């Protein structure tokens, strides 16, 4: 393992905090930003993966903030990246200007379609279909019957070599002026776009009633529902999207199962995920 520059947080000022960690700068006009992930994501392997993925995504021509180097903060590892000054996430814009919620949903849809049309580096990035099959095998919070139903569904999904974000939602596009950037890329892969869209559906319809989720995204339950409705209409080109919603619900169940691969859930998380898989299976796999 290489030796990395050691950072003292006393020299930095915190400017942000999200679900995965905190961000810092040395001064108000700094062109670089320090990102320190939460404990589970600050081990060397996780940060090196984040660094390599960011470089690989940028090489595909996808707009992402430049990542410069890995550093150490105490026992944790972190990254120094390009600071996008004046940036706001689409979810923050929805909070600050609620009347623009539909506009932000249409923007996420357009940028999503651009992403889904981009050929991926399938030698570097994983197949989401393969990951889903592996997750079904490894999960301990799904019954044997539901595991077979999920496996049958995944096997019916065609392999796809186009890009997927992995955490496709309005908090993961930031906007600065007329420029938009994708962030939080550690789950990047390739596959059917509905894997990403199922994740968005899960947030907007299944997790949205939770106060913690509303706080993370700075959006109300009503805004989440408006956001999904506009996104679905824009994506399908139709005002009626019940069939699209039902398909998204099926992929949402897979998204929960994929937590087994992405975050190695603890006992309490397994109970949580198991509850929502059963709920989704009952509604969308019956």
Where do the language-model regions lie?
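Inter-domain helical "communication" segments and dimerization helices
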Residues: 86, 90-95, 102-104, 110-132, ...
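Active-site activation/catalytic loop segments of kinase-like enzymes and analogous catalytic loops
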Residues: 197-237, 252-268
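Short beta-strand-loop-alpha-helix junction that forms the active-site gateway
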Residues: 38-40, 187, 259-260
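ATP/Mg2+ or Mg2+-diphosphate-binding catalytic cores
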Residues: 242, 254-286
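Conserved N-terminal boundary motif of the eukaryotic protein kinase catalytic domain
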Residues: 6-14
């Amino acid at each position: 393992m290489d030796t990395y520059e050691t950072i003292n947080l006393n020299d930095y000022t915190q400017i942000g905090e999200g679900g995965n960690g905190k961000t810092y700068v040395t001064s108000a006009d700094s062109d670089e930003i320090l990102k320190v992930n939460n404990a589970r994501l600050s081990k060397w392997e996780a940060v090196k993966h984040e660094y390599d993925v960011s470089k690989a995504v940028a090489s595909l021509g996808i707009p992402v903030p430049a990542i410069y180097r890995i550093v150490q903060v105490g026992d944790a590892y972190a990254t120094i990246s390009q600071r996008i000054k004046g940036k706001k996430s689409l979810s923050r814009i929805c909070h600050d200007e609620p009347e623009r919620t539909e506009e932000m949903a249409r923007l996420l849809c357009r940028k999503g379609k651009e992403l889904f049309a981009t050929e991926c580096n399938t030698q570097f990035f994983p197949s989401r279909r393969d990951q889903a099959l592996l997750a079904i095998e490894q999960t301990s919070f799904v019954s044997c019957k539901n595991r077979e139903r999920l496996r049958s569904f995944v096997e019916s999904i065609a392999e796809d070599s186009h890009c997927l974000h992995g955490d496709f939602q309005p908090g993961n596009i930031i906007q600065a002026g007329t420029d938009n950037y994708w962030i939080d890329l550690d789950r990047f892969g390739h596959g059917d776009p509905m894997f990403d869209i199922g994740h968005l559906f899960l947030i907007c319809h299944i997790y949205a009633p939770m106060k913690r989720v509303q706080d993370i995204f700075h959006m109300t339950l009503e805004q989440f529902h408006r956001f999904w409705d506009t996104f679905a209409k824009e994506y399908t080109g139709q005002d009626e999207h019940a069939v699209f919603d039902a398909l998204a619900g099926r992929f949402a169940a897979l998204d929960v199962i994929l937590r087994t691969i992405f975050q190695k859930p603890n006992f309490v998380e397994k109970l949580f995920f198991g509850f929502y898989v059963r709920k989704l299976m009952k509604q969308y796999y019956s």
